[in-house]
């Protein structure tokens, strides 16, 4: 009987370790973040840089508001600008992190959104762009991770590129299931850190979000 209860306690601790989170690109107030926190969501990932080539000031404020609500795991993501008129890869990271610092707040992890949108066909150039972003983040002492999946990675840098496999992976796959069971390894990652399991939906407290899960 004693062993039975120990087994139950261990099972419960594993289940309770799983965490729910959201990523957002619309304005959310501190009070709404408090509602989201109370609804059981423990990590937040606002967008802090637009693919159009500018800092997402709404996202930076979301970082600040989320922390003011008592959330401690607050990240940010960059949707890079790939046009010839855009700032360099390093300067996009610099602008994002400088904006976060200027707002008097911080992010836990900077995620680089690597998905098919305006990326050139040149894998070598794309790899260099990503490497420059990662290097700039590390120069700031900022923890950095990659947002991508098998098909995006294949098209943008090629499946033989494992250059960022030491970083955490945020994996989008809208299968409606909060687990890693359908994950297919790519880019040197044996498993992801986060699963984005639902595309944009009305989430906690009426906010439009993508739903995420950490086991």
Curated annotation (Swiss-Prot):
<feature type="domain" description="Ch-type lysozyme">
    <location>
        <begin position="18"/>
        <end position="215"/>
    </location>
</feature>
<feature type="active site">
    <location>
        <position position="113"/>
    </location>
</feature>
<protein>
    <recommendedName>
        <fullName>Lysozyme-like protein 5</fullName>
    </recommendedName>
</protein>
<keyword id="KW-0081">Bacteriolytic enzyme</keyword>
<comment type="function">
    <text>Plays a role in resistance to Gram-positive bacteria S.aureus or B.thuringiensis infection.</text>
</comment>
<dbReference type="Pfam" id="PF01183">
    <property type="entry name" value="Glyco_hydro_25"/>
</dbReference>
<keyword id="KW-0391">Immunity</keyword>
<dbReference type="GO" id="GO:0007165">
    <property type="term" value="P:signal transduction"/>
</dbReference>
<dbReference type="InterPro" id="IPR017853">
    <property type="entry name" value="Glycoside_hydrolase_SF"/>
</dbReference>
<keyword id="KW-0732">Signal</keyword>
<dbReference type="GO" id="GO:0031640">
    <property type="term" value="P:killing of cells of another organism"/>
</dbReference>
<dbReference type="GO" id="GO:0003796">
    <property type="term" value="F:lysozyme activity"/>
</dbReference>
<feature type="active site">
    <location>
        <position position="23"/>
    </location>
</feature>
<dbReference type="InterPro" id="IPR002053">
    <property type="entry name" value="Glyco_hydro_25"/>
</dbReference>
<dbReference type="GO" id="GO:0045087">
    <property type="term" value="P:innate immune response"/>
</dbReference>
<dbReference type="GO" id="GO:0009253">
    <property type="term" value="P:peptidoglycan catabolic process"/>
</dbReference>
<keyword id="KW-0929">Antimicrobial</keyword>
<feature type="active site">
    <location>
        <position position="115"/>
    </location>
</feature>
<dbReference type="InterPro" id="IPR051595">
    <property type="entry name" value="GH25_Enzymes"/>
</dbReference>
<dbReference type="GO" id="GO:0050830">
    <property type="term" value="P:defense response to Gram-positive bacterium"/>
</dbReference>
<comment type="similarity">
    <text>Belongs to the glycosyl hydrolase 25 family.</text>
</comment>
<dbReference type="GO" id="GO:0016998">
    <property type="term" value="P:cell wall macromolecule catabolic process"/>
</dbReference>
<keyword id="KW-0378">Hydrolase</keyword>
<keyword id="KW-0326">Glycosidase</keyword>
<feature type="signal peptide">
    <location>
        <begin position="1"/>
        <end position="17"/>
    </location>
</feature>
<keyword id="KW-0399">Innate immunity</keyword>
